[in-house]
UniProtKB/Swiss-Prot annotation:
Keyword Cytoplasm annotated: no
CDD domains (alphabetical): ABCG_PDR_domain1, ABCG_PDR_domain2
Entry protein name: Pleiotropic drug resistance protein 3
Gene behind this protein: PDR3
Family: Belongs to the ABC transporter superfamily. ABCG family. PDR (TC 3.A.1.205) subfamily.
Binding-site positions, ATP 2: G892, V893, S894, G895, A896, G897, K898, T899
Function: May be a general defense protein.
One GO cellular component term noted in the UniProt record for this chain: plasma membrane
Main location: membrane
Ranges where the ABC transporter domain occurs: 173-445, 847-1099
Length: 1447
């Protein structure tokens, strides 16, 4: 396919259009005069009448005021009666319906590349006709250098607990000699250039060369922690002088979107936030000039231009246009989805990322690897549209691509080639080869120029391109190439341009944006409010679940604190206080899920905030306002269900005052947790902070320990705890009521006595002070939430580098390059030899599939659009075979069903309905045995983040290789695979989280392949193994894959953008079309001759051009638009072909087992025995935990903080027992420690296990281990960490509180706490295993916490719990913990104390009031260790039986 648009072609095309128009008008006049028949006359009269109507309508528009005229156009009526009559009506373009917008865009753009070109040409012609000037942006960068600070460490640069603790200590100490060693690494090194308007520039270079940093720097999105020198300017303005984020856009390589929104909604809101920019002013100027000149525009072009120029539209015609040209119209109403929620494909997400920015009015685009996951045909189509945008509208576009096909490469005007932070070439595309020929390198025939440019800088690939005749080859380093470029005429020309300052007077006034945001404040607020409301509707399940859960807890609470069982006396006053305090706990903890819900949205917020879509306040205020009705609803439910049933004071006014206070508490709670999430910004840190906050506000609320009993130096905590005011307000409201005014013998009322004993003796007006204080806290937290999002950026981590690696980087000079080059040819040969030696014993197997169909239940969105079928078919009549030693490519456009077919064949589908026959080696496929002989490289690279590359491969080898292979051979094989896939240079790196830390996209992809290859499978499925890789990395991977296939293995790969070399490395091709139908299966042949011969044999299919990539040509000629153009269904053509008949014969032959063969059978389901599985899983968990400071260090620090707070707050109260209140205080110390240290551990483990669960699903599908082995390892690795926590708690709190010293009592204290931490942690694991997502697990967890609080025996002692709930008391683990702690400490103490105005021993009081008896401690000890065993067993059961991954 030739280049679509050049400047000469544009001018020629304009002249042709004018000539065609004149000819058509002349022809029309001639033909009109020649027709004399009645029917023709009638038709002519009808057309004339319509034309006259249209002209009258346009005249009416012209008479309208300017505001209305700019919103009105002639819009073609959708008339089903007479399609030939093009009657138009005056329409307000802001009120076009969804159907009208759809029909309009379908009419304007049928064939995307051609019709989009026509549309842009017509727009430009209209603009030029009246002399309106378009804004343009020229971007210059001069001597740009970017440096990053890295922390130097000795040994492996891994974030272990020890390294993290040492770093924290050093940063806190700030002592000379203790500060971290820092090193500066150059990311970009003195680069200069000009990105010109009206030209397409391609940015090439290997991963890690600085492409992303350059794009971010030029677009003004660079991280503030990086040191930047040099100058960047737009039209002569420096970056500090305007708002670069509104003048240009950076399209990230990471696809971050809100999963609950549809594709259309994502683009609609993006369009709304970005505004219309200069379009409105251009349209106003254009309309005025046309009116003055008497020019009547094309009605369709007028409609389109007006529709996209009006600000603040909720539904925009521009969205429909972008959906169409990006091929997203077929999934416009599909949810975006995420890892756990079904949505659009990876390729569609990548296109959505592009569409999200180009839907706006931006004139300068910096696009980072926008083709990852897209087939070459789709990539070509998108880049062609971008080229048209650049050439016709004078946009400035710089695009980074990894593997551009030759046809896509030819669409660009300029090339920038980078390596190691330096620019090796920046100049015209046509001159790139000439420059490298001057350096001694020549691009071979049938080699893509882009692939050549990327490989010529590589040490291992450069030699094959050497063409110097006068001297022998010597490695030409990056520094040498950079110097040669600086001496070239291309760089000299750049220097000349940069030396001449840009004339600001030439800059269009709308080229540069000086406003931070596109919309007025009110419009920003409205847009954010409507989006937040939409997301609340989409997450309605969570809110309904929370509300129902609260109602259930309220019903339990009111039947525990039943009014018929409680009197108005001093004893029962404690129970009423307990009920009030419990209400506060419930509404406080109910806000806890706000943490996770806020955190999950932050990544998208930070992206859109950096793009200046909206300010933080526009995001936070709607989030706050829309929670008010929910908060009010939950408060009403709680108060109305519990108030009168429990038996609080019956006055209606007091009921409403309690309701108001509970509402204020709930608002404070959700505001506080939102604020903590915005400050901490990661789920682990915010969970820890949330736990500490709950601990603090409850301990200082005045209930657990009364204010008079607090140490004097800590009483300030009472006044800054929000819950204090909730406690004061509720207590004053209740105990100053008339029914509590009975006088005691001490001449004080019962109510006043109760308030005074708790330090809550305040006057009635303190209720209103409390309400105001709580709303004040709410406002304060929301202001903090806004400020945190305004000033704190997305979380990152300082890079860590070893001293050895830093020395290597600093010493990388030509001398080192020459030394490395001397070994170059030898290393290349070794690479080929290593690949060929992967010959561990295996059984060659074929895979046959016949008439495979795959259906899913029809999505609700499609049903709403009128789709009547109950099932949606994604694969239709797929028949084929995969054979040993044959490398098969599975191809098709994005969304054709490639991954779906791979999942079906591999047995990875968890939803839907599969029909048809699949056989392995001639025998029906049995998934359990098939998993042992197959490997699956998934499209999403899912790995444990806290282990190294080498450990990931070793883990796979240990569990999947045959047990008879000895350890030495396994290690050698692992080493071989690592070297073959070229991971040896990074084998000590942590895998990390995608897009956050650790490996890059291409390194992660290669690791996925290595993990599967090391299993030595007979059949390997690879889903897009080269996506995200540059040309050289893709060649490395495919060379390794080809060598594996040559050993006799069966391999099938889906592939999107193969170069000619990679495509022709395959032996066979399976090609699917949209709808999951097969249109080709057969041999490729030498130079793809068989495939080309087949398609060229079909009538109307255009012939392939010389040196054209066969893969791109094939996808282009079989695309949906091509099918429509030539009226052919390629699936039907294939079904009726001789090739199909031959293939059916082959399938029949392979469907029967070969003579003497046996069905697959293994004596055991897994390769390793149970002990081997557990040992290997435990080994992985050991390293993962040791390298997870965000998890283990945070919860350990929480334990230290909680222990210190508890020790200080209850300082030396352990032996000072005088009355019942002193016993309650000590019991409160135990209660808070048990509940909140346990809650923190349970909450902290949720995100960790959730992350590892995704890895478990992949590894379980691969048949690596039994679920129980994974679960047991996960459970066992927690024990030493929890042991250390319990020990630290005991060592700190025991002496500070001053308990009785005896080995027996100390041991019981430690044992109770250790068992508590165990069962809380295992509870968190269990909840993750039985729920689909982290937020649901967090909400369900909160209900467990509330029950553990209510039935712990602290708020309501066992003796007072109604008999219909006493079973729940015995079922609650915290009741046994507190029993063990309090009874072991005081159950044998015979000291007399005053209890409710009578004398009793401590032991007797414990027995009478709490029901705790010293002789029952052996039973308590048994029950305490039973709970962790039960929760751990349930975790193992659910993690094995349930699978929430939807595929």
């Amino acid at each position: 396919m030739a280049q679509l648009v050049g400047s000469d072609e544009i001018e020629s095309f304009r002249m042709d259009l004018a000539e065609i128009g004149r000819s058509l008008r002349s022809s029309f006049r001639g033909q009109s005069s020649s027709f004399r028949s009645n029917s023709a006359l009638s038709a002519s009269q009808k057309d004339d009448a319509v034309d006259e109507e249209n002209m009258l309508a346009w005249a009416a528009i012209e008479r309208l005021p300017t505001f209305d005229r700019l919103r009105s156009s002639l819009f073609e009526e959708i008339n089903g009666n007479d399609a030939n009559v093009k009657r138009k009506r005056v329409t307000d373009v802001t009120k076009l319906g969804a159907l009208e917008r759809h029909v309009f865009i379908e009419k304007m753009i049928k064939h995307i590349e051609h019709d989009n070109l026509q549309l842009l040409h017509k727009i430009r012609k209209r603009i030029d006709k009246v002399g309106v000037e378009l804004p343009t942006v020229e971007v210059r960068y001069k001597n740009l250098t970017i440096e990053a600070e890295c922390e130097l460490v000795h040994g492996k640069p891994l974030p272990t607990l020890w390294n993290s603790l040492k770093s924290i200590t050093m940063n806190l100490a700030r002592l000379p000699g203790l500060q971290s060693e820092l090193a500066k690494i150059k990311i970009l090194n003195d680069v200069s250039g000009v990105i010109k308007p009206g030209r397409m520039t391609l940015l090439l270079g290997p991963p890690g060369c600085g492409k992303t940093s350059l794009l971010k720097a030029l677009s003004g999105n660079l991280d503030k922690s990086l040191k930047v020198s040099g100058e960047i300017s737009y039209n002569g303005y420096k970056l500090e002088e305007f708002v670069p984020q509104k003048t240009s856009a950076y399209v990230s390589q990471n696809d971050l979107h809100i999963p609950e929104m549809t594709v259309r909604e994502t683009l609609d809101y993006s369009s709304r936030f970005q505004g219309v920019g200069s379009r409105a002013e251009i349209m106003t100027d254009l309309s005025r000039r046309e009116k003055e000149a008497g020019v009547v525009p094309d009605p369709d072009i007028d409609t389109y231009m007006k529709a996209i120029s009006i600000e603040g539209q909720k539904k925009n015609l521009q969205t429909d246009y972008i959906l169409k040209i990006l091929g997203l119209d077929i999934c416009a109403d599909t949810l975006v989805g995420d890892a756990m929620r079904r949505g659009i494909s990876g390729g569609q997400k990548k296109r959505l990322t592009t569409g999200e920015l180009i839907v706006g009015p931006i004139k300068a685009l910096f696009m980072d690897e926008i083709s990852n996951g897209l087939d070459s045909s789709t990539t070509y189509q998108i880049v062609a549209c971008l080229q048209q945008l650049a050439h016709i509208t004078d946009a400035t576009i710089l695009v980074s691509l990894l593997q551009p096909a030759p046809e896509t490469f030819d669409l660009f005007d300029d090339i920038i080639l980078m390596a190691e932070g330096k620019i090796l070439y920046h100049g015209p595309r046509n001159s790139a080869l000439e420059f490298f020929e001057s350096c001694g390198f020549k691009c071979p025939e049938r080699k893509g120029v882009a692939d050549f440019l990327q490989e010529v800088t590589s040490k291992k690939d450069q030699a094959q391109y050497w063409h110097g005749t006068k001297e022998t080859y010597k490695f030409v380093s990056v520094d040498m190439l950079s110097r040669k470029f600086k001496e070239s005429p291309y760089r000299k020309k750049l220097n000349e341009e940069l030396s001449v300052p840009y004339d600001n007077s030439r800059s269009h006034r709308n080229s540069i944006t000086f406003r931070d945001y596109s919309l007025p404040k009110w419009e920003l607020f409205r847009a954010c409010m409507s989006r937040e409301f939409l997301l609340m509707k989409r997450n309605s399940f969570i809110y309904i679940f929370k509300t129902v859960q609260l109602a259930i807890i309220a019903s339990i609470t009111m039947t525990v604190f039943l009014r018929t069982r409680m009197d108005t006396d001093l004893v029962h006053a404690n129970y009423y206080l307990g009920a009030l305090f419990y209400a506060l706990i419930i509404l406080l903890v109910d806000g806890f899920p706000e943490l996770s819900m806020t955190i999950t949205r932050l990544a998208v917020f930070y992206k859109q905030s950096e793009l200046c879509f909206y300010p933080a306040w526009a995001y936070t205020i709607p989030a706050t306002i829309l929670k008010i009705p929910l908060s009010l609803l939950e408060s009403v439910i709680w108060a109305s269900m519990t108030y009168y049933v429990i038996g609080f004071s019956p006055e209606a006014g007091r009921f409403f005052r309690q309701l108001l206070l509970l509402f204020a508490v709930h608002m404070t709670s959700i505001s506080m947790f939102r604020f903590l999430a915005s400050v901490c910004r990661t789920i682990v840190a915010s969970t820890a902070a949330g736990g500490l906050s709950i601990l603090f506000v409850l301990c200082f609320s005045g209930f657990i320990i009364p204010r008079p009993s607090m140490p004097i130096w800590l009483k300030w905590g009472f006044w800054i705890s929000p819950l204090t005011y909730g406690e004061i307000g509720l207590a004053v409201n209740e105990f100053l009521a008339p029914r509590w005014q009975k006088t005691l013998p001490t001449n004080t009322s019962i109510g006043n006595e109760v308030l005074e004993s708790r330090g809550l003796n305040f006057d009635g007006y303190f209720y209103w002070i409390s309400v105001c204080a709580l709303f004040g806290f709410t406002i304060l937290f929301n202001i903090g939430f806004t400020l945190a999002l305004t000033f704190l950026k997305a979380p990152g981590s300082r890079a860590i580098i070893s001293t050895d690696k830093y020395s290597q980087i600093e010493g990388s000079s030509d001398s080192i390059d020459k030394a490395d080059a001397a070994e170059n040819s030898k290393a290349t040969m070794d690479s080929h030899e290593r690949a060929g030696r992967m010959v561990l014993p295996f059984e060659p197997l074929s895979l046959v599939f016949q008439d495979v169909q795959y259906y899913v239940d029809t999505p609700a969105a499609m049903t709403e659009l009128g789709f009547t079928q109950k099932r949606l078919q994604l694969l239709s009549d797929i028949t084929g075979a995969l054979r040993p030693g044959i490398l098969t490519a599975l191809m098709g456009v994005s969304g054709a069903g490639k991954t779906t077919l791979l999942d079906v064949l591999a047995g990875r589908k968890t939803t839907g309905y599969v029909e048809g026959e699949i056989k392995v080696g001639g025998y029906p496929k049995v998934q359990e045995t098939f998993a042992r002989v197959s490997g699956y490289c998934e499209q999403t690279d899912i790995h444990s983040p806290q282990i190294t590359v080498e450990e990931s491969v070793i883990f796979s080898a240990w569990l999947r290789l045959h047990p008879q292979i000895d350890s030495k051979t396994k290690y050698e094989f692992v080493k071989e695979v690592i070297e073959t896939i070229e991971l040896d240079g990074i084998k000590g790196m942590l895998v990390g989280m995608p897009g956050v830390s650790g490996l890059s996209t291409e390194q992660r992809k290669r690791l996925t392949i290595a993990v599967e290859l090391v299993a030595n499978p007979s059949i390997i499925f690879m889903d897009e193994p080269t996506t995200g890789l540059d040309a050289r990395s893709a060649a490395i991977v495919m060379r390794a894959v080809k060598n594996v296939a040559d050993t006799g293995r069966t391999i099938v790969c889906t592939i999107h953008q193969p170069s000619i070399d990679i495509f022709e490395a395959f032996d066979e091709l399976i090609l699917l079309k949209t709808g999951g139908r097969m249109i080709y299966w057969g041999h490729l042949g030498r130079n793809s001759c068989k495939m080309i011969e087949y398609f060229e044999g079909i009538s109307c299919v255009p012939k392939i051009k010389n040196n054209h990539n066969p893969a791109t040509w094939m996808l282009e000629v079989t695309s949906t638009s091509s099918e429509a153009d030539i009226s052919i269904d390629f699936a039907e053509v294939y079904k009726n072909s001789a090739l199909h008949k031959n293939n059916e014969e082959l399938v029949k032959k392979l469907s029967f087992p070969p003579a003497g063969s046996k069905d697959l059978h293994f004596p055991t389901r897994f390769s390793q025995n149970g002990w081997g599985q557990f040992k290997t899983c435990f080994w992985k968990q050991y390293w993962s935990y040791w390298r997870s400071p965000s998890y283990n260090l945070m919860r350990s620090l929480h334990m230290l903080f909680a222990s210190l707070v508890s020790g200080l707050l209850f300082w030396d109260k352990g032996k000072k027992l005088d009355n019942q209140q002193s016993v309650f205080s000590v019991f409160g110390a135990m209660f808070t420690a048990v509940i909140f240290c346990g809650i923190n551990n349970s909450s902290s483990v949720l995100p960790y296990v959730t992350t590892e669960r995704s890895v478990l699903y992949r590894e379980r599908f691969a048949g690596m281990y039994a679920s129980w082995a994974y679960a047991l390892a996960q459970v066992a690795i927690e024990i030493p960490y929890l042991l250390a926590q319990a020990l630290a708690f005991t060592v700190i709190t025991y002496p500070m509180i001053g308990y009785y010293w005896s080995a027996y009592k100390v041991f019981w204290y430690f044992y109770s706490m250790f068992c508590t931490l165990l069962y809380f942690t295992y509870l968190g694991m269990m909840l993750v295993s039985m729920t689909p997502s982290f937020p649901v697990a967090a909400i369900l967890q909160s209900s467990f916490y509330t029950m553990f609080n209510l039935f712990a025996g602290f708020l309501m002692p066992k003796a007072q719990i109604p008999k219909w709930w006493i079973w729940f008391y015995y079922l609650t683990p915290t009741s046994w913990t507190l029993n063990g702690m309090l009874t072991s400490q005081y159950g044998d103490i015979e000291k007399e104390i005053t209890v409710f105005q009578e004398k009793k021993t401590v032991a007797a009081f414990l027995g009478d009031y709490f029901g705790f008896h010293h002789n029952q401690l052996p039973i308590v000890a048994f029950v305490l260790i039973a709970y962790p065993l039960v929760f751990a067993s349930l975790f193992a059961f659910f993690i094995g039986k349930l699978n929430f991954q939807r595929r």
